[in-house]
Amino acid sequence: MTNIRKTHPLMKIVNSSFIDLPAPSNISSWWNFGSLLGICLILQILTGLFLAMHYTSDTMTAFSSVTHICRDVNYGWLIRYLHANGASMFFICLFLHVGRGLYYGSYMFMETWNIGVILLFAVMATAFMGYVLPWGQMSFWGATVITNLLSAIPYIGTDLVEWIWGGFSVDKATLTRFFAFHFILPFIIAALAGVHLLFLHETGSNNPSGLSSDTDKIPFHPYYTIKDILGALVLILALSSLVLFSPDLLGDPDNYIPANPLNTPPHIKPEWYFLFAYAILRSIPNKLGGVLALVFSILILALMPFLHTSKQRSMMFRPISQCLFWLLVADLLILTWIGGQPVEHPFIIIGQLASILYFSLILIMMPLASLVENNLLKW
């Protein structure tokens, strides 16, 4: 008799995705982040669900309801901080996952990569709206500043902003709709992640060498299930340490002050995972130009397959490209630091130079380096 996992309509989908899936024998720990992102998403949906049971999306009671969750609900403080810091872990895994894709040329799987870029935008939108919900000072002013960027769109900008706000300022209507969208988006993300996986399994995984691994495949279970469990344990250890020892490390103290439209915080800044994009936005003195640079700083990922000029897929055997890749990583860290600094003298110019370097590396220097390396192969 054939095994039920190979015949049952539902079980055979699970089987072909997580059990009998042929996987390259040489994929490193950089390939763990897909499963970690899945774990993060499940954790966020579960903790978010329990938070939503006690949260009220009204301007008068939102801040108090979050306080109530932390003080009065059983383990409410734990659920709240798991959710807030879970978002940080989600973005750490996301950035490492995307970085892995860039380094090893995984973007050559066009469909998988493009769904991934859409996923990145969806997760960023979800995180932004989630940050507005506690209705603290940084929530309110962050929502005001970021939504206001849409007013830079010619002709329809102002109408668009007021339509999103549901009035003439960020108010009750804005908070209610942000809560609704923040609740629904993770489920859309889960569906997109399924499509992401579907497209990936059409081609099979890439591997560090960038060469075809069809001649050397191993079953996903038990090899990579065990490996993923180890990754999950490391993730849980890191998240638990953050939540239990310093839950407010990555948050902003201003968000413990209830939202006040009459009092602007001295430095309006988003959560740490948006700072690199925020620095690029601020480095351009023109409003529309800044918004375009902000969007393009992430949308540029969709251009990666077209900017690939190398004869080799992976950067494993390309030392010049490797140097430029790590320069890009350093540049993003500098942008993240600048995004959290006030707009004054050394920081403005550093931010502008880092922004120019960011686009130059991706659009000009890395494709040129690949061409140079192609010629070096002939020697």
Curated annotation (Swiss-Prot):
Name the Pfam families on file.
Cytochrom_B_C, Cytochrome_B
- Keywords annotated in UniProt: Electron transport, Heme, Iron, Membrane, Metal-binding, Mitochondrion, Mitochondrion inner membrane, Respiratory chain, Transmembrane, Transmembrane helix, Transport, Ubiquinone
The record's annotation in Gene3D superfamilies points to: Cytochrome Bc1 Complex, Chain C (1.20.810.10)
Name where it's found. Mitochondrion inner membrane
List GO BP terms, alphabetically: mitochondrial electron transport, ubiquinol to cytochrome c
Name the family the entry cites.
Answer: Belongs to the cytochrome b family.
PANTHER family, alphabetized:
CYTOCHROME B (PTHR19271:SF16)
Q: State the name under which the record lists this protein.
A: Cytochrome b
> Source species, please?
Mogera imaizumii (Lesser Japanese mole)
Q: Which gene encodes it?
A: MT-CYB
